[in-house]
Amino acid sequence: MSERKWAVIAIGGNSLIKDKNHQTVEDQYQAAKETCHHIADMIEMGWDVAIGHGNGPQVGFILRRSEIAHKVAGMHEVPLDVCGADSQGAIGYALQQNLNNEFYHRKIKKSVATVITQVLVDKNDPSFQHPTKPIGGFMDEAEAQRRVAEEGWSVVEDAGRGWRRVVASPLPKEIIELDVVQTLLNNGICAITVGGGGIPVIEDENGNYLGTAAVIDKDYASSLLAQKIKADLFLISTAVEKVYINFNTPEQKGIDV
């Protein structure tokens, strides 16, 4: 039997949205379809894969719907950690279905499963004292200050656009469902995991996990996963064709390998 090759593939949340005119669920599904075609190519070449993905734009949409529903119909708002879980399920569904379809048409006997994944962060991570990650929509100053007083939000002003909530971006310490992911991989099942960097949780004094309002960098979480499963390859999929130096400047230059 040939030696197994392990790969962790991190898909950018923005790579599921081609441009501002292609943001619908169907648009994202079609982008996922294209991505899964390439992943299936790797699997056909003998790779066992775990797939991580970003969720920034998708969580932004979920939060916006929540804010509108709250203002218009008085619906309860959705906490950030639950938004992350929602997006893991939705994006995982799109990837899972497209991979299953690829396997069927290629006659590959393979299964794929999405794992709703929690990632432990340190409640004393310095980023909690200096949150910088903007989330949600813009607010006027009165609304922003009300949120600060009543809900303990951190907010910043964006000149000319209003106020916006900011949250911490702590480093990932431990993947709670790692054993589940490892079991899937050991049995030849593709695992979709650490979506959006994982749902950030902290541990209380009694050893219980609690969701927290934060955003974990999906590349850090996927890198941690690659280390833990001793992957042979860590691959990051983005919306651009290659790595650039001086990105988005007149001096931008692609790096070829």
Q: What does each model-found stretch correspond to?
A:
Residues 1-50, 62-68, 183-186:
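N-terminal glycine-/serine-/threonine-rich phosphate-binding loop
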Residues 22, 87, 93, 145-147, ...:
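An N-terminal domain-start capping segment
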Residues 28, 32-35, 84-92, 173-178, ...:
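Generic structural signal for well-ordered, non-membrane alpha-helical segments
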Residues 17-18, 60-81, 129-190, 194-257:
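Active-site phosphate/oxyanion-binding loops
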Residues 37-131:
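Glycine-rich nucleotide/cofactor/substrate-binding loop typically near the N-terminus or early
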Residues 9, 51-53, 108-116, 191-195, ...:
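General beta-strand structural signal in soluble alpha/beta enzymes
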Residues 32-42, 95-98, 219-230:
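Short, well-ordered amphipathic alpha-helical segments that serve as non-catalytic structural scaffolds
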